[in-house]
């Protein structure tokens, strides 16, 4: 006998279904469910008097035939779609996206629930892949906690702590420092990978860093991003299949943008803070978004362009790059990097999909706990200033949402050779997942999973009789303690380092995963973010044009996902 319920009642009980729409936080972004993998009337839900009980939604199958964990009735937002489904986890990986239940008595079951299965309630929750921040200055280990509590589960970058070199550049220089940081990060509740220093004109100093365990190389102007250094670094990267990230020459001392592009010789490279306020050829580094071999990213202090953006940048820059306000040349260096015209254009290039990634520049002109938040603030600003994208409809912003979520998930994963392991909600990948209440999407996650274990969560008073009494704040859970870190977190290193016996040499607890397939990438491989417009930058007015069109927008004075959610 069937029973008919209203859409509202169904959504309250089982979460939204096909055609239902959800507002993301307090933004103007709306998503619409494209497909529901569950079966009406056969949904699984845990609780007293609910479906997942012995002989009902729970089967008699043994451990090897059932999921370790099922996230029920969740709304998945990923680059490939916006759908509702049950998500099954097995041995720390995503094993199935579909319909969970008891196949002995229920139809359309694609994953079994048994006595060995834990349930995470995903009803009226949004599920995303853990974020990847590929521009980390490892200045303080406490960054990892702030990153995770905004949905970041992987940190790629360089540094050795609060040293002058680390505060300015994302490099972990030399084998001793690389080994030291691999050991030190072994207890961090975070996936990590370290870039070696790429600024040298001969190959052997780079090769020894890759063999020591660097997952990539970083070129930074403060170490000298010369033609010879860029050329040499890319040649070594091609040999060992690791990515190169570059911060180019702001003052055009060793060459201009055209010289840097020539040094690249059409080889794949990741350009950091491509707009230029974070550094790079002044004023036209932003033009590299038109190059097929360049995989460009933004850092979050310029995201999005607001009435406060310019004012805060000068002091940040002086501190981070060891400059002195009483030296005129230092002040001129700083002021040359901060241009409202290129920052405004950056908003639009992000929305066009010409800038492919988002990152933080943590504690070095960027905020590690705001990568996800700033991404969606930018998407909101562009929605209200530029309107609906032509790929979307008046009913939803699904394509725009897929474009923006790819910027901090799948695209940095592809760029840095880790998309075989992480970066999306897809079968076979490690279960680094984040659950959000829609009203808090992008601002404050509810649960963060690492490798299939709950690593962090909002949690109330541990002495209370239930989990919810105040004070409710973020705390590490069991996946963030003891041996849980070993199974739930990973360290990314070069293939050459693994082949050379790094595992036996350092005896790290975390699993080491190789980076691969980084050197044949092109801009077209950046999902939903592959535009290569013809770029022009006026050297006098700093006006930016893409395919002949002037790119400009106003500075916003009010943003969502801001004071409504935070006391401080």
From Swiss-Prot:
Task: Give the Pfam families listed for this entry.
Answer: Amidohydro_1, Urease_alpha
**GO terms, biological process:** urea catabolic process
**Residues holding substrate:** 220
Task: State the superkingdom.
Answer: Bacteria
- Location within or outside the cell: Cytoplasm
The catalytic activity, as recorded, is:
urea + 2 H2O + H(+) = hydrogencarbonate + 2 NH4(+)
| GO CC term (a single one) | cytoplasm
Residues bearing the modification N6-carboxylysine:
218
Catalytic residues of the enzyme: 321 (proton donor)
Q: Is Translocase given among the entry's keywords?
A: no
Protein name according to UniProt = Urease subunit alpha
Q: Which gene encodes it?
A: ureC
